[in-house]
Amino acid sequence: MRKKIEIIAEVAQGYEGNEKLANLLTKGAIASNTDAVKFQLVYADELATPDYEYYQLFKELEMMPRIWIDICQKIHDAGKKVYFDVFGLFSLDMAKQVG
């Protein structure tokens, strides 16, 4: 019996905290005929302390839950799966809530 290979479009954090870019990348991933789309749910407080030199960069990657809900809905409406990399309890809870 042959197993089906799942093809995943890895967006990661390529959306750069930008809602328009996240939607554009989502649209491209859906159009690419993949089985799933994967993002990194980045929240600065899960990755670093405020005194870390790249803390603000991580803060800029954060997006509001309503944006993630909208993105996940588009992906599900297209019949695709959504996967997330999570880095702590907050992003895990967010993934459960939106995905």
Each language-model region and where it sits:
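Hydrophobic faces of well-ordered beta-strands that scaffold small-molecule active sites
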Residues: 7-11, 35-39, 82-85
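Glycine-enriched alpha-helix->loop->beta-strand junction motifs that scaffold or abut catalytic
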Residues: 33, 96-99
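N-terminal small/glycine-rich loop or linker at the start of catalytic domains
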Residues: 1-16, 50-51
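Glycine-rich, proline-tolerant flexible connector loops at the mouths of alpha/beta enzymes
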Residues: 35-65
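Glycine-rich anion/phosphate-binding loops
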Residues: 14-28, 65-66
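Active-site beta-loop-alpha junctions enriched in small/polar residues
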Residues: 12-14, 40-44, 87-89
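Catalytic beta/alpha-barrel core
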Residues: 58-63, 80-88, 99
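Conserved, mostly hydrophobic/aromatic
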Residues: 10, 29, 95
